[in-house]
C-alpha cells in the first residue's frame, strides 16, 4: 500500500459510495477529519449550493455519535483498519463492506459482510465505476461526481501509464458518458506554486544508487500535502533514462514517508514490505519511524543491496 496517497484519494472514493446511497434513498455521510489542499477542489464540488446536504462530510467524532448497530460502514481503498479515517468506527457496527484494490496482509478489517478486493484493478475508482453501472436502480452520476471518479483513476494510474488495462479504459469511457470533463479534472489536480517547486527540488537533488535506483528527499516545509508531492516526485523520476525504480523520502509529522515507483523491471512492493510497508508491483510505500532522513536513506540502500545479493531483484 502507498500510504501517502490514501488521504488524497480517500475522499474521492467515499463520494462514489455516497452517489449510490443517494440514489437508493439512504442517508449517507463521508468521514473526513482534515481537508487538505489536494482535497479542497473536490470538496467544493459537493456544497449545499450544488444540492448536497450540509452534513455530507462529518468528522470522526461526529460519526462515532451517529453510529449504531444498524449502520453500514463502507471502507474504501484500504483493507487495513489503521489506514481508515476512524478505526474505532469499525468496532461500533457489524455491518462493514470493504472495497479495495490492494493485496491483503495479516492486518485486515475483520468479519466484513462483503469484501470486494481486486488487486488487478487499477484503482478503487475503476472498481466502483464498474459496480455503479450494474445497479438495477440505474444510477445517474452528476458531472461533478463523474469528474471526481475520473480524477481518482488518473491519480492511481499516473495518467493511464501504470496498472492500466482494458477495464480501466472502459470505466473511463463510462465516466465520460456520465459527463466527466478532462479540462475540469485537470484543473482539479493542479498543484500550487510551493508544491510544484518542492517536487522540482526533489527531482533536482535525486541521487542515483547502483546505476539504476533514484533516491531523493522531498522538502516538507511550506507545503500543505508534502507526502502527495513526494509521490508525484517519485513518478517524475521514472522519466529519467536508466532509472528502474525511484524512492522519495518525505519527513512529515514525526515520520519518514517513503514513496516508491517502478515501470516494469523492479517489484517495489517487495522492497517496501521489507521496510514494513507494501503496495503494488509498480507503486508502493512505507512509513519509517525513529530514524533520521539519512538513516532512512541508508535503510533503503541496505535493503536494495540485500535483495540484489539474494536475487530477489535484478
Where are these regions (language model features)?
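Glycine-rich, phosphate-binding/catalytic loops in enzymes
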Residues: 17, 90-93, 114-115, 171
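Short acidic, glycine/serine/threonine-rich loops at helix termini
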Residues: 41-44, 86-87, 108-111, 129, ...
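Hydrophobic helix-and-loop "lid/oligomerization" segment in the mid-to-C-terminal part
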Residues: 1, 7-47, 64-72, 150, ...
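Short alpha-helices
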Residues: 101-172
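A generic local secondary-structure boundary/capping motif
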Residues: 61-64, 84-88, 115-119, 138-140, ...
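Conserved beta-strand scaffold positions in the cores of enzyme catalytic domains, especially
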Residues: 96-98, 113-116, 213-215, 248
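Active-site cofactor/cluster-binding pocket
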Residues: 52, 56-111
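Short, motif-level signal for alpha-helix interfacial/capping segments enriched in acidic residues
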Residues: 77-80, 133-136, 257
